[in-house]
Amino acid sequence: MTYKFPQNIYYQIVIWKDTDHFKEVLDILHSRDYTDAIAVGGDGTVNQVAKSIIGTDIALGIVPAGSGNGLARTLGLSMNVEEVIKQIAEGKQVKIDHGTVNNIPFFCTSGIGFDAHIGNLFATSKKRGLQSYVKITFRELLRYRSKEYTLKFNDQEIKRKAYLITVANAGQYGNDFYIAPQAKLSDGKFHVVILKPFTFFSVFGVLIHVLRGKANESSNIETYVTDQLTITRSEKGPIHFDGEPEMQKEQIIYQCFHQSLKVIVGEKFQGL
């Protein structure tokens, strides 16, 4: 990949080995006059780099190398290495929002329920890869039971039994799988998507709506718009942020921070 950058651009490539090494990389990034931080990897890698430059003048660029590449796709960046490096070199920049879930930053989506449950099982599975993820998903699809949640936002409180709740800063999980097609990255708002309990047969209708980019039109889905949200559940359990699972307490607090991150975008970006 190194030879593909234009000759007039100075860059340094660093491969970090562990958390301590990554901290050293960040020290270098912030102590010198670098203008951009380019993350090469999937949404987990992108999250690590992005959260380290929130509120700075350093712009995030992405060379997508993951399975979903949700943020890269939303930013209109190419999945082709040569093309995305051209986009990075052109350097078109905008500012986007980021969210926090119990003070943990995320940039695409976060949530609780089925998707967090699957992420937690996959993280502890001995088998890796897409095949293992799909196998776990189908195994758990009808085993998993919807849970009761209390949501507080916009001076209201609602109680819902939900299969999952997704808090979307960006509209998609990845792979152009849009759970919140009307969400915008720079409007200072989350789209809170509640998937209600469904039957075996109705799940296909939900999937068709999502695959067509019309999840908000499904009768099994409710969507609300807010910049702050508190979700309370009866017990501790997994959440996810940009697909990364973590066990968290009963109360989950979300906050949206308006245009807090500078990013490099492609010509097809429509998030403003």
Where does each model-flagged region fall?
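Glycine-rich beta-strand-to-loop/alpha-helix junction loops that act as flexible
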Residues: 40-42, 63-65
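ATP/nucleoside-binding phosphotransfer catalytic cores, i.e., glycine-rich phosphate-binding loops
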Residues: 159, 194-272
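ATP/NTP phosphate-donor binding region
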Residues: 1-37, 47, 51, 156, ...
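Short glycine-/acidic-enriched loop or helix-start segments at secondary-structure transitions
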Residues: 48-50, 71-73, 176-177, 204, ...
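Internal helical hairpin/lid segments
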Residues: 166-206, 212-215
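Short hydrophobic-aromatic micro-motifs
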Residues: 104-110, 159-160, 164-168, 173-174, ...
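A generic structural signal for short beta-strands and their flanking turns/coil linkers
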Residues: 145-147, 161-163, 186-191, 225-227
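Catalytic core of DAGKc-family lipid kinases
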Residues: 16, 55-59, 65-163
